[in-house]
């Protein structure tokens, strides 16, 4: 089980690592994949299945070899029939971090930031497990109009590419509203997540 302090520290570390990558690849788009899982346990078979499906889906779109994890329908295989892909590999860098505070994956692509966001939103919206993935696309300091060395990145919002905000897993309200109001119980969310995983995996 992860404490709140551990979770907050992991978020700070993630932001710091994003800054490091933005400094290293100032003219590219940075993608950060995490898993949305309720409760204090952030690393288990569910989170890893979702994470590796996300890694495979991102590699399928932008290029690369994927996670190598075998799932029935391979999650990304289900998605690959519908996903739009770039015609050649645009992946400059990728990294996976399997942490107790939650799986993290980073991808640097030489695709314009708004196009990268559009492609990542396609994964979130059409992949069988996409609603359990949080795929952030971050502008580099140069892409944000800042100077290299400023140590800042800025996320691209869905509204910038004309998409509505993400919807709740259990109802049609904006997910943010349900999270703030604690509209649904953790048990309800976990049951929904389990049913989504059981629909496409061997677990």
State where each predicted segment sits.
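Short beta-strand/turn micro-motifs at beta-sheet edges
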Residues: 18-22, 95, 157-158
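Interaction interfaces in information-processing and related assembly proteins
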Residues: 28-30, 35, 50-70, 90-131
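Cys/His-clustered metal-coordination modules, chiefly Zn-binding fingers
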Residues: 128-142, 152-203
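A generic structural motif
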Residues: 37-42, 111-113, 174-177
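A cross-taxon signal for low-complexity, glycine/charged-rich
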Residues: 68-70, 87-89, 145, 151
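General detector of N-terminal leader/presequence modules that precede the first folded domain
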Residues: 1-64, 90
């Amino acid at each position: 089980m992860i404490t709140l302090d551990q979770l907050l520290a992991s978020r700070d570390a993630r932001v710091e690592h994003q800054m490091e990558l933005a400094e290293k690849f100032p003219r590219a788009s940075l993608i950060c994949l995490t898993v949305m899982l309720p409760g204090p346990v952030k690393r288990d078979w569910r989170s890893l299945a979702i994470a590796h499906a996300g890694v495979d889906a991102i590699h399928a779109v932008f290029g690369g070899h994927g996670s190598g994890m075998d799932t029935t329908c391979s999650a990304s295989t289900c998605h690959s029939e519908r996903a739009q892909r770039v015609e050649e590999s645009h992946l400059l860098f990728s990294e996976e971090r399997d942490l107790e505070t939650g799986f993290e994956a980073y991808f640097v692509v030489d695709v314009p930031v708004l196009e990268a966001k559009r492609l990542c939103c396609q994964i979130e919206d059409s992949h069988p497990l996409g609603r359990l993935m949080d795929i952030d696309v971050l502008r580099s300091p140069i892409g944000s109009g800042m100077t290299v060395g400023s140590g800042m990145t800025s996320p691209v919002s869905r509204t910038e590419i004309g998409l509505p905000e993400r919807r709740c897993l259990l109802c049609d309200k904006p997910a943010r509203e349900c999270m703030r109001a604690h509209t649904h119980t953790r048990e309800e969310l976990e049951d929904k997540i389990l049913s989504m995983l059981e629909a496409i995996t061997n677990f």
